[in-house]
Every structure is written in C-alpha cells, then in structure tokens.
Design a protein with these regions (language model features):
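Oxyanion-hole/transition-state-stabilizing segment in secreted/luminal serine hydrolases
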Residues: 204, 221-259, 263-267, 278-283
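Catalytic His-Asp segment of secreted/periplasmic serine-dependent ester chemistry enzymes
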Residues: 283-355
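A short helix->loop->beta-strand "cap" motif at the edges of active sites that frequently abuts
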Residues: 268-273
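N-terminal secretory targeting modules
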Residues: 1-179, 346, 350-355
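Structural motif
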Residues: 146-148, 240-242, 274
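A general structural detector for well-ordered alpha-helical segments in enzyme core domains, enriched
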Residues: 200, 256-260, 290-297
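Serine-esterase "nucleophile elbow" of acetyl-processing enzymes
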Residues: 137-139, 145-221, 225-235
Length: 355
C-alpha cells in the first residue's frame, strides 16, 4: 500500500502557515461580520441552545454543527489564513472531509463585486481538534472575502490570519439582508457537498446576494411544534420547508407538516413560504405518498386564499441538470445535484423576494 501524496504532489496537504508577517484576528470581533450563527456557552451554534434542547436531544447536538455559518470582511491581504479549534469532527465514508469538516473561501474581484468561489481550506485527514490552513491570492488589492464554515462539525473558535499591514474593513451588507430560513434534513444541512460553498443555500446566497440561516438537522427534522414555535418568530425574507423524508412514517408527516405550515403562516401572514419534497427523480411508492401529503398542505393553503405559498417537487429540482445521477447514495446530492436545486429554487426565490 502507498500514499497517493508520495507520487502526486497535488495531493499533499500543507497545514503550516510559513508567513513572517501574519497577524491573527478573532472572527467574532469587528470588523468581521458573522452570519448564520450565534455564540453561546463557548461555541458556535445555529439557534439558541435552550430552544434546540426544547425540540429534541438530537437537534440540541446537531445545533453545534456550523452549517450555513459565514464570516465576511474586506481586505487587501495577499493571503487569508484560518486557525480553527474544533471539538467534534464529522467523518463519513460518503462525504468529503472538506465538506463535513472544512472551510472554504469566496471572494470578489474588488471591494463591491460579485462573489466567486476560490477554493477550500483543505483539512488534514487525521486532524483531531481543528486545523490551520492558508489560501494565497495572486495580487494585493481590496476584495470582499467570505469564509464558509464546516457543515457537520463543531467549532469552538476561529482566528483569521492576514498580512500585518493589510487593510481590514467591514464587508458590505447583503442586498437581501433579511435571511432566507431553510428548515429540513441532512440535505438541508449540506450532505454530501464537497465543500460548504457548494450547498444549494450558499449557491443561492451568491446568486441573489442574500443572507440565510440553515436549520437543517440531519435525520432529526421531524416538524416538531417546538421547532415551529421557534421559527415563527424569526425575521426572514422567505421560509423554505423541506423535511418530508425525516418524518418517521407517512402518518407522522401527515400529523406535523400542515400543522407546522399553519403555525408559521399565522405568525407571519405575508411571508413567502416554499415547500419542497425530497430531491429525487425516480420515486417509489412511499416517496409518492409523502409527496401527496405535502402537496395537500399546499393545496389547502391555496384553497384558503394563500397567495404566498409555493411548491417545488424534488424531481423538478433535480431534472434541470442531473436527474437521479445527482445523488451520491439515492438520498444526498452531489455538487451537481446541489447546483440543480439551487438553480430552480434560486430562480423562484428571486422572483418572490424581489417582486
């Protein structure tokens, strides 16, 4: 047996900084701007710990996963480094470590331009409590930088390393500053994207220049009333409801789906709500039954005069680019699958938010 990095240097993962002029900053402090996360009890989380605990033990644990977390800033540094401390590393055989436990970087060509994907801060395979990594630019000029956080790992601290003499400023606001809130399953959380910036929420965020909150809870999105009561009070530009395949049975889905929709609709009568079904083209009998349950939620809302509810089937979401080939394991999307979802859902969100 041999190590591929011994024969192909492109697979060597460098974790040393090797920068004499580096200065580190805590990502929680100004002028850095944190999105999609809060900081409680010494760690990052996606909703308050008390609210998560009130939903279920599983949601309380997964709440520490930093899916959808981002930090944004403007700098002219020739490089951006990270030093991350993590106390839970998500490792799965069908999920790239750069996605489950890595950070990646998006940037603009100037201080106000559209974001472009640069690359991942690739973690070492054997890391135990975090890692350090650096990404270089080929020139020194002011640009917006966005660092996406790991999808399935827990983060205690993040320090960002920049040239000691660099410009460091607050990033401009998102064009759509009220977040789109996504609630759902492992797919919503980001499995199995190759890096955090490849999830459909991140792609849509770049498409629309919008903030977002990822409330995907792997295997644990059951449409609980406690979760509905938490979400209904959030300030948001749109809500995406996507958990049909996490309900244990069709009966469970029937008992919770419309109830969750109504809870949020009563609290926010004018909020655009998009209902999704599982992203899959080749449906079995149970898939069809589950789709019929969520379609009934939609049909009933329309019947009662709701003009701000929308339904996108999973087969429609996937057919744009990929069909069923966009799934890793007949459940979780590949990067191409996420892109297909992002195109179709993003076009709808653009229409309904910006109308």
């Amino acid at each position: 047996m041999y190590n591929i990095s011994d024969v192909d240097r492109n697979f060597v993962i460098s974790t040393g900084m090797k920068r004499d002029d580096i200065r580190f900053f805590d990502a929680r402090n100004d002028p850095f701007r944190l999105y999609g996360l809060m900081f409680e009890n010494g760690r990052f989380c996606r909703m308050t710990n008390s609210a998560a605990k009130n939903v279920s033990d599983a949601v309380f644990r997964l709440n520490r996963n930093t899916a959808g977390g981002r930090v944004r800033f403007v700098t002219d540094s020739e490089y951006v480094a990270i030093s991350a401390k993590m106390d839970n590393i998500g490792r799965m055989s069908h999920f790239s470590l750069t996605g489950s436990a890595g950070f990646d970087l998006l940037y603009s060509k100037d201080s106000n331009g559209d974001l472009l994907y640069k690359k991942a801060f690739v973690p070492p395979y054997d890391m135990k409590d975090g890692y350090e990594s650096v990404i270089d630019f080929d020139s020194r000029k002011k640009r917006v930088v966005e660092i996406n956080f790991p999808l399935y790992s827990d983060l205690i601290s993040l320090n960002i390393g920049l040239c000691a003499d660099c410009v460091l400023e607050k990033a401009p606001d998102y064009k759509i500053d009220k977040p789109v809130v996504y609630y759902g399953s492992s797919i919503t959380q980001g499995a199995c994207a190759s890096s955090p910036g490849k999830t459909y929420q991140s792609i849509i965020s770049v498409m629309l220049d919008c903030d977002y909150l990822n409330l995907g809870f792997s295997g644990s999105a059951k449409g609980e009333q406690a979760m509905a009561d938490y979400i209904k009070n959030l300030e948001m530009s749109a809500f995406v409801l996507d958990y049909d395949y996490n309900a244990l049975t069709i009966q469970d889905l029937t008992e919770t789906h419309e109830k969750m929709f109504i809870t949020i609709r009563k609290a926010q009568p004018d909020l655009p709500i998009v209902i999704l079904s599982r992203p899959k083209c080749l449906l079995n009998e149970e898939d069809i039954c589950r789709f019929n349950v969520i379609k009934k939620t939609y049909d009933n809302a329309v019947c009662f005069g709701d003009k701000n509810v929308y339904l996108l089937s999973g087969s429609y979401l996937m057919n744009d680019l990929t069909g069923n080939e966009g799934l890793v394991d007949d459940i979780h999307p590949t990067d191409v699958g996420f892109m297909s979802i992002a195109r179709n859902l993003g076009n709808l969100l653009k229409e309904i938010i910006l109308k």
